[in-house]
């Protein structure tokens, strides 16, 4: 099973690439999306506005790949870029695959939020969430998605406010947490992801 990790030109992609390899993916890192992969990964590095500029160059190709059935995983910022807009840096358009805006955590808490927190299911479980309910996952973020619909929110976490931890719609899945830093829970999720791709 082949995965393409998109290189936005910022950040270290080693962790997510290594985690995918550990569960059996063949991983390529490239800055151009292609249609000959089982999974395309938007990693969790950079700022929303900077990544939005990169995404804009390939927006139609990403949309075409999604419509053709290519599977996508977005991690942290990679999940956030799948929403309509983000305010980090400056207000910028995302891909719009999920309805809602990405904004700073609106609570009197220390930011960035770094560390372990529980995830909990908010909808009937899907293949992606098996074994994850009430388990600890790792976060590094100051911004969260504020969706206009809960239809695609399968898991949440809480840090001052409740926010989406895992979203999914057809062939697109996003996690606010970092599976590559979430120890055994992250490995469980990535194993689930392989099964979800084979569905």
From Swiss-Prot:
One of its GO terms (biological process) is L-histidine biosynthetic process. Residues 2-199 form the Glutamine amidotransferase type-1 domain. HAMAP family: HisH. Pfam families: GATase. Keywords: Amino-acid biosynthesis, Cytoplasm, Glutamine amidotransferase, Histidine biosynthesis, Hydrolase, Lyase. PANTHER family: IMIDAZOLE GLYCEROL PHOSPHATE SYNTHASE SUBUNIT HISH. This is Imidazole glycerol phosphate synthase subunit HisH. The active site is at 76 (nucleophile), 178, 180. Its EC number is 4.3.2.10, 3.5.1.2. It comes from Saccharolobus solfataricus (strain ATCC 35092 / DSM 1617 / JCM 11322 / P2) (Sulfolobus solfataricus).
